[in-house]
Amino acid sequence: MKITQEEVTHVANLSKLRFSEKETAAFATTLSKIVDMVELLGEVDTTGVAPTTTMADRKTVLRPDVAEEGTDRDRLFKNVPEQDNYYIKVPAILDDGGDA
């Protein structure tokens, strides 16, 4: 499956990323190769092969859900450069949120 430069540009725009034309072409080529490799997996005959759900040889180990005392909020916010009513203020990275 060929990934076009237009598709790469579209996804980059949704992600608020900017790439040069050369980078976009390289991404399109690389992504096309990756998709082709993944599509090859569909050709493998897995008849009679049991599904693999995990590579771990043990079952999920869950800890008891016990409430513990948390860290003091004032102590946590001691090193925060800017805050407002216990919210950490950070610089905006998106102009208006776009259409994503």
Swiss-Prot record:
Sorted alphabetically, the Gene Ontology BP terms of this entry are:
glutaminyl-tRNAGln biosynthesis via transamidation; regulation of translational fidelity; translation
Give the enzyme's EC designation: 6.3.5.-
Q: Which family does it belong to?
A: Belongs to the GatC family.
Matching InterPro entries = Asp/Glu-ADT_sf_sub_c (IPR036113), GatC (IPR003837)
Lineage, top-rank taxon, reads Bacteria
Q: What class of enzyme is it?
A: ligase
Alphabetized GO MF terms? asparaginyl-tRNA synthase (glutamine-hydrolyzing) activity; ATP binding; glutaminyl-tRNA synthase (glutamine-hydrolyzing) activity
Known partners and oligomeric status: Heterotrimer of A, B and C subunits.
User: Which gene name does the record give?
Assistant: gatC
Q: What is this protein called?
A: Aspartyl/glutamyl-tRNA(Asn/Gln) amidotransferase subunit C
Keyword annotations from UniProtKB, A to Z: ATP-binding, Ligase, Nucleotide-binding, Protein biosynthesis
- What is the protein's known function? Allows the formation of correctly charged Asn-tRNA(Asn) or Gln-tRNA(Gln) through the transamidation of misacylated Asp-tRNA(Asn) or Glu-tRNA(Gln) in organisms which lack either or both of asparaginyl-tRNA or glutaminyl-tRNA synthetases. The reaction takes place in the presence of glutamine and ATP through an activated phospho-Asp-tRNA(Asn) or phospho-Glu-tRNA(Gln).
Report which reactions are catalysed by this protein: L-glutamyl-tRNA(Gln) + L-glutamine + ATP + H2O = L-glutaminyl-tRNA(Gln) + L-glutamate + ADP + phosphate + H(+); L-aspartyl-tRNA(Asn) + L-glutamine + ATP + H2O = L-asparaginyl-tRNA(Asn) + L-glutamate + ADP + phosphate + 2 H(+)
Tell whether Protein biosynthesis is among the UniProt keywords. yes
The record's listing under NCBIfam families reads:
gatC (TIGR00135)
